[in-house]
């Protein structure tokens, strides 16, 4: 390995961004590249563990003291994060150079495009990392270029636009930040600005794989120097080449592994409905009650992740009433759960990490998207990849229990479910092939490593 075979990786400070980028670090480390993973946090020692001696985890303050209450104003919060990184990252780079371990590239989260100028000002290559799929980034790009007008309603069903290599999209298929721009002005600006300087970026990385977005990728690659490196699911669930890569190594939440697995072990194959909406989605009380009723009425066993902050919304005596039919937990070991033989389908918010896990592990899905890129992911999950169905909300954006029961029956019992399971298995194989030796993502990771080794 030559001097300077070293890159810095800097994710946005949210678990949904840290997880795929830290997984990418493991793949790079397995190919003898030195990595400094910079985690922005208010803690002096972020709770991330790695078995790789070539991955060094370095914390950078987010501008807040540990335990200090963060501002609810996103503009203020991100200004402090940006200021803190700009003040501390240059010294970190200089110290690395003085220590004889100079970095040659900065891999940074797409939501922080200003880091490209920091990289270039210190002679580093700038590699932007998109934690969302191209199907979403392409939409944001057209908004940025002014070729698509932001609609004003979320629940309208009129056709709005057709993008290159994408299916026709309705209002309820678009990222929520576009349809509710007045509700999320800062976030809308952030997601659009991801593309603001992409034409100057040296390398474009994305947590997807070539076969998954094949048609769209032909157009994308004609515009930018793209390397798809996903799915960033731990190796032991895919190609099994990295024996130590059994989990994500980073979690903000405790997982009650034994409780979940013992309960699942007592169930028949493909008999359990697994329900999890990630770490950020908050259901209104009426919606949570409706979902609870739907799960109960479906007649199937179910494992439902209900965070502690949400449990007070459950119907009175619900836990006692469902008995052995259902298990509610505050968090679950999702990868272990999804690969358990008892799981029949995955009810998901369609966040990209969860969607990619479902695809990679061959699990049929029921999409119940809420915001961000979730509606667009759900559209592709149902209509393009055909690995699940999407619940339909009413005119008020409310999903009724009857609709939920109907969708569970489609996936778990109906003929449609057989075709969905067949497609899910197909994508599982393709995901494994992508990261296996000689696969498209493996080749792309090798190409990236060759630039700096």
Swiss-Prot record:
It comes from the Eukaryota. This is UDP-glycosyltransferase 74E1. One of its GO terms (molecular function) is UDP-glucosyltransferase activity. Its EC number is 2.4.1.-. CDD domains: GT1_Gtf-like. The keyword Transcription does not apply. UDP-alpha-D-glucose binds at residues 279, 332-334, 349-357, 371-374. Keywords: Glycosyltransferase, Transferase. Pfam families: UDPGT (PF00201). The keyword Ligase does not apply. The gene is UGT74E1. Belongs to the UDP-glycosyltransferase family.
């Amino acid at each position: 390995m030559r001097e300077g075979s070293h890159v810095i990786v800097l994710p946005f400070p949210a678990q949904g961004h840290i997880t795929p980028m830290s997984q990418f670090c493991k793949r790079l480390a397995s190919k003898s590249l030195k990595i400094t993973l910079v985690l922005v946090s208010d803690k002096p020692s972020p709770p991330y563990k790695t078995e790789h001696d070539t991955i060094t985890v370095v914390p950078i303050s987010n501008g807040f003291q540990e335990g200090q209450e963060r501002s609810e104003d996103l503009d203020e919060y991100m200004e402090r994060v940006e200021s803190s990184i700009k003040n501390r990252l240059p010294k970190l780079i200089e110290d690395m150079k003085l220590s004889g371990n100079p970095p040659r590239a900065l891999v940074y989260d797409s939501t922080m495009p200003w880091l490209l100028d920091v990289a270039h000002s210190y002679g580093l290559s700038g590699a932007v990392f998109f934690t969302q799929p191209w199907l979403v980034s392409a939409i944001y790009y057209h908004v940025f270029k002014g070729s698509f007008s932001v609609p004003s309603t979320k629940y309208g069903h009129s056709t709005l636009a057709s993008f290159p290599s994408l299916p026709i999209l309705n209002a309820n298929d678009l990222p929520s930040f576009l349809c509710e721009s007045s509700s999320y002005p800062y976030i809308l600006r952030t997601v659009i600005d991801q593309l603001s300087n992409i034409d100057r970026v040296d390398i474009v990385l994305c947590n997807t794989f070539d076969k998954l977005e094949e048609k769209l990728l032909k157009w994308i690659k004609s515009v930018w120097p793209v390397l798809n490196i996903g799915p960033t699911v731990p190796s032991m669930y895919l190609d099994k080449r990295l024996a130590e890569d059994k989990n994500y190594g980073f979690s903000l939440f405790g997982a009650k592994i034994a409780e979940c697995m013992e309960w699942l072990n007592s169930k028949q194959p493909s008999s359990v409905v697994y329900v999890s909406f990630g770490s950020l989605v908050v259901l209104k009380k009426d919606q949570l009650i409706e979902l609870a009723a739907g799960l109960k009425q479906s007649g199937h066993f179910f494992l439902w992740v209900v965070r502690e902050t949400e449990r007070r919304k459950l119907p009175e005596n619900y836990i006692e009433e469902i008995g052995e039919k259902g298990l509610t937990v505050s968090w679950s070991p999702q990868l272990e759960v999804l690969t358990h033989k008892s799981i029949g389908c995955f009810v998901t918010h369609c966040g990209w990490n969860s969607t990619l896990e479902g695809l990679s592990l061959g699990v049929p899905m029921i999409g119940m998207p809420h915001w961000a890129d979730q509606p667009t992911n759900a559209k592709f999950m149902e209509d393009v990849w055909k690995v699940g169905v999407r619940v339909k909300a009413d005119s008020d954006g409310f999903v009724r229990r009857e609709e939920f029961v109907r969708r569970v029956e489609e996936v778990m019992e109906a003929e449609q479910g057989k075709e969905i399971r067949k497609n899910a298995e197909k994508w599982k194989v393709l995901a494994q092939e992508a990261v296996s030796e000689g696969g498209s993502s493996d080749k792309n990771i090798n190409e990236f490593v060759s630039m700096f080794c």
